């Protein structure tokens, strides 16, 4: 929004041209989102407490979690507000990729909001019925996938980039839509599964978003793209502003969500953030690298799949409890230890993902 204003004011004062610089707007985006989160956070938490919108704790979970009962949830509204507010201020709104990311993120956030609302306000333990949650996720992801496929203007936009290989870039054709669908829905639900401990999901999200911002910037810069031998995708550079907004909003939320948490993000936050990571990875053509960088999310998801599959097929559990972070809690690890060690793993996964830019 301010890009439009700056373009107009540049006619009268050339100094306003500074706001056309992408890196400056990215810095201002992260700072704006951070300030919005820190400013709005206390008010939101007090409002949630007043409305008694508190987390319900599973009876079969770790005993240490019983003290979390009643902690305000739906804090993901704070993240969404900061991301949307900062992105709308500092991103170039003529860029259609920006709108795709914001609309998908908002759509999944609404699905999560309805689920949270039914659970904590209407006291329905099931929340939004699983089939309806999956239906609306599928609708949003499918619309985005179809739009991106039919609006693509160059082959690189629908090709699969294989990490660590320079010249392996097969054209997906219509399979692109199927892959995009699974990446968006899968990443959204993976982040949702990870959000079980204080700060556990938000820090890996921050790291992955920052890394995706780097991928967006270099793939949207013709010189960097040529040097790194990756496809030049001119529309992706502007996604750096959205990625930094996610980083800023995430850091602001972590201020309140760090152990012991004052607020939880709820499905409104986890589903939205996961969808944002998924759609950005698709746009910058780094779906396979997302699988690497989001290694913690992958671990959490696979642990649930293994647990359910093993119990149905063999009548035995693989882990003491799934997702896997609860397994380590039941082994006696204090919650902060589980969280920080998973953060360290996430950092390692992200660094490996970034290394694919040169190790080709």
Curated annotation (Swiss-Prot):
EC category name: transferase
Cofactors (names): Mg(2+)
Keyword Ligase: no
Pfam families from the UniProt entry: Glycos_transf_4, MraY_sig1
Keywords: Cell cycle, Cell division, Cell inner membrane, Cell membrane, Cell shape, Cell wall biogenesis/degradation, Magnesium, Membrane, Metal-binding, Peptidoglycan synthesis, Transferase, Transmembrane, Transmembrane helix
GO cellular component: plasma membrane
Main location: membrane
Highest taxon above the source species: Bacteria
Topology class, membrane: Multi-pass membrane protein
Catalysed conversion reaction: UDP-N-acetyl-alpha-D-muramoyl-L-alanyl-gamma-D-glutamyl-meso-2,6-diaminopimeloyl-D-alanyl-D-alanine + di-trans,octa-cis-undecaprenyl phosphate = di-trans,octa-cis-undecaprenyl diphospho-N-acetyl-alpha-D-muramoyl-L-alanyl-D-glutamyl-meso-2,6-diaminopimeloyl-D-alanyl-D-alanine + UMP
EC number, UniProt record: 2.7.8.13
MF terms (GO), sorted A to Z: metal ion binding; phospho-N-acetylmuramoyl-pentapeptide-transferase activity; UDP-N-acetylmuramoyl-L-alanyl-D-glutamyl-meso-2,6-diaminopimelyl-D-alanyl-D-alanine:undecaprenyl-phosphate transferase activity
Pathway(s) per entry: Cell wall biogenesis; peptidoglycan biosynthesis
Keyword Cell membrane belongs to the record: yes
GO biological process: cell division; cell wall organization; peptidoglycan biosynthetic process; regulation of cell shape
UniProt-listed PROSITE patterns: MRAY_1, MRAY_2
Localization in the cell: Cell inner membrane
Disulfide bonds: none
Transmembrane segments: 25-45, 73-93, 97-117, 128-148, 168-188, 199-219, 236-256, 262-282, 288-308, 338-358
PANTHER family: PHOSPHO-N-ACETYLMURAMOYL-PENTAPEPTIDE-TRANSFERASE (PTHR22926), PHOSPHO-N-ACETYLMURAMOYL-PENTAPEPTIDE-TRANSFERASE HOMOLOG (PTHR22926:SF5)
Similarity comment text for this entry: Belongs to the glycosyltransferase 4 family. MraY subfamily.
Function text: Catalyzes the initial step of the lipid cycle reactions in the biosynthesis of the cell wall peptidoglycan: transfers peptidoglycan precursor phospho-MurNAc-pentapeptide from UDP-MurNAc-pentapeptide onto the lipid carrier undecaprenyl phosphate, yielding undecaprenyl-pyrophosphoryl-MurNAc-pentapeptide, known as lipid I.
Name of the protein in its database record: Phospho-N-acetylmuramoyl-pentapeptide-transferase
Organism (species): Idiomarina loihiensis (strain ATCC BAA-735 / DSM 15497 / L2-TR)
Gene behind this protein: mraY
